[in-house]
């Protein structure tokens, strides 16, 4: 093979892209009562359009799934209804493994993705396993955020041909434009676990970047109104603590009662207000115990619902680490400074109390995402007692205000431009901090190439102002069998976003390059 032929083949690989016609489904409005038993026995299921002929995504893309799926949909003034018969050539082999919520485990499952704004940026995902486990989340180009939870209904049933399901998704679980005629992006997924086959109603090519951009169309929804989205949850919590007091030589009891309120309100079809007053996260999952022998702090996952629900906009730029809020007091070790020989610290709060939290987020019909987050942290003091019984208090955490502001504008071809600002303001002469981010993410018209860059600026205001910067630029080919990435990243030695962000270390320059050849065709060996 001569050089000219080699170059020609390589050029074809670079520009290769599967082309499939976008599928569509016309949904009808029907007033019908459903007996949620997972069986499609009601007459309405027999009169609606069928979505079938799923295309395999993995292990080998492009073939029609050998497991037939027949999906039906209709809607009324309150919700969208989905029912499906999922056929299996070996019904006894369907995996019905039970798992926790938001975890498919080792079970067969089916899901639907709904993008009401048809902007291919984010979508609502609803999944049910053959064992009846529900999974929901917000899908984006970064994956699926399963911390998002909604109230919806599902039922599944074993059948002689495989299994079947019924779903009811109320409009209160969705955000959609305020217009009389709706046209949404939509897709269905199915996984047959024992053979690891994943298929979709509208084909999703693994060699093309992004799954939401490869959705089908849902049309036919008309004259539906988004319901009032309002939730008020007052609560009270009591604590009883029993411990041994060495000074008194006996067991002692401590009692504490707290109370607060959570509020969630849909300002309009696009924006939601979340507020919490005197939050109590005592019921959230505890962190794993980690013995840290390294030079860097441990980055923990966020488990508090207020800080994980509806925070996708605040993750832009990578400068918001919510675990900074309500963490150890800012001057936790100050209580150990200037201790006299006859003094000891008898009480030093290990976490700063949260007074309130507020966030507003959403995206307009023109693709402008707006996010505002604010939280106030209370004061803490350590109690120091001397040998004569004298007491004094040392402030370990000042009153602190945390603020995040985000603007993100969607553009053509799933591109975007964003601005993020985080600010930490502490009372008195304590340290303040500010970080600003500008980010540009551009895709070519065919979705094959991507340019992404960001510029970050930090300012730590203490006795003096310490400024720093971070810069990133990259060019990637993100679709096709041949993919590559070239990138550059630098951080100045004074860049410090850690008052409200997380950075292991600064003062570095990184050049990177990668090349991938992805072959999804079936061979004798694979």
Show where each model-derived region lies.
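Bacterial Sec-dependent N-terminal signal peptides
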Residues: 1-25
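Structural preference for beta-rich elements and adjacent junctions enriched in aromatics
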Residues: 21-408
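Membrane-embedded beta-strand positions of outer-membrane beta-barrel proteins
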Residues: 38, 234, 275, 360, ...
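Repeated loop/turn-to-beta-strand initiation elements of outer-membrane beta-barrel proteins
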Residues: 80, 271-273, 367-372, 379, ...
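Transmembrane beta-strands of outer-membrane beta-barrel pores
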Residues: 88, 130, 171, 190-192, ...
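Outer-membrane beta-barrel channels and translocator barrels
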Residues: 117-119, 172, 227, 268, ...
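Extracellular loop and loop/strand-boundary signature of outer-membrane beta-barrel proteins
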Residues: 246-249, 343-346, 388-393, 423-427, ...
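Exposed, low-structure sequence patches enriched in small/polar residues
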Residues: 353-355, 361, 433, 446-526
């Amino acid at each position: 093979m001569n050089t000219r032929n080699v170059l020609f083949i390589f050029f074809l690989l670079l520009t290769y892209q599967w082309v499939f016609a976008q599928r569509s489904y016309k949904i009808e409005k029907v007033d019908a009562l459903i007996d949620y038993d997972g069986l499609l026995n009601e007459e309405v299921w027999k009169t609606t359009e069928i979505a079938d002929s799923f295309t395999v995504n993995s292990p080998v893309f492009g073939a029609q799934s050998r497991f037939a799926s027949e999906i039906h949909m209709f809607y009324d003034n309150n919700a969208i209804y989905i029912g499906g018969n999922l056929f299996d050539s070996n019904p006894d082999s369907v995996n019905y493994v039970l798992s926790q919520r938001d975890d498919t485990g080792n079970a067969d499952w089916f899901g639907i993705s709904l993008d009401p704004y048809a902007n291919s940026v984010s979508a609502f995902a609803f999944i049910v396993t053959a064992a009846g486990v529900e999974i929901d989340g917000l899908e984006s180009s970064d994956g699926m955020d399963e911390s998002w939870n909604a109230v919806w209904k599902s039922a599944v049933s074993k059948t002689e041909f495989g299994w079947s399901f019924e779903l009811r998704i109320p409009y209160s679980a969705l955000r959609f434009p305020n217009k009389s005629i709706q046209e949404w992006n939509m897709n269905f997924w199915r996984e047959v676990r024992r053979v690891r086959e994943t298929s979709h109603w509208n084909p999703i090519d693994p060699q093309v970047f992004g799954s939401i951009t490869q959705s089908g169309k849902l049309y036919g929804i008309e004259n539906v109104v988004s319901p009032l989205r309002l939730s008020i949850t007052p609560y009270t919590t009591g604590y009883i603590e029993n411990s041994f007091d060495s000074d008194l030589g006996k067991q002692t009891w401590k009692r504490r009662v707290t109370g607060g309120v959570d509020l969630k309100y849909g300002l309009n079809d696009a924006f939601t207000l979340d507020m919490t007053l005197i939050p109590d996260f005592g019921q959230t999952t505890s962190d794993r115990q980690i013995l840290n022998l390294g030079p860097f702090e441990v980055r923990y996952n966020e488990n508090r619902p207020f800080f994980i629900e509806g925070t996708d906009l605040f993750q832009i730029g990578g400068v918001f680490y919510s675990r900074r809020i309500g963490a150890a007091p800012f001057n936790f070790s100050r209580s150990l400074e200037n201790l006299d020989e006859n003094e000891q610290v008898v009480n030093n709060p290990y976490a700063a109390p949260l007074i309130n939290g507020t966030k507003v987020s959403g995206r307009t019909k023109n693709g402008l995402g707006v996010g505002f987050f604010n939280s106030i942290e209370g004061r803490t003091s350590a109690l120091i007692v001397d040998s004569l019984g004298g007491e004094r208090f040392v402030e370990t955490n000042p009153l602190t205000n945390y603020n995040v502001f985000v603007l993100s504008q969607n553009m053509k071809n799933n591109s975007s431009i964003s601005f993020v600002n985080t600010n930490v303001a502490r009372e008195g002469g304590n340290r303040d901090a500010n970080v600003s981010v500008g980010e540009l993410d551009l895709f070519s018209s065919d979705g094959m190439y991507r340019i992404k860059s960001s510029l970050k600026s930090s300012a730590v205001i203490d006795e003096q102002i310490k400024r720093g910067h971070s810069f990133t630029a990259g060019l990637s080919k993100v679709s096709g069998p041949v993919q590559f990435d070239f990138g550059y990243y630098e951080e100045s030695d004074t860049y410090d976003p850690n008052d409200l962000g997380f950075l292991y270390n600064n003062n570095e320059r990184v050049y990177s390059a990668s090349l991938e050849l992805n072959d999804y065709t079936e061979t004798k060996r694979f």
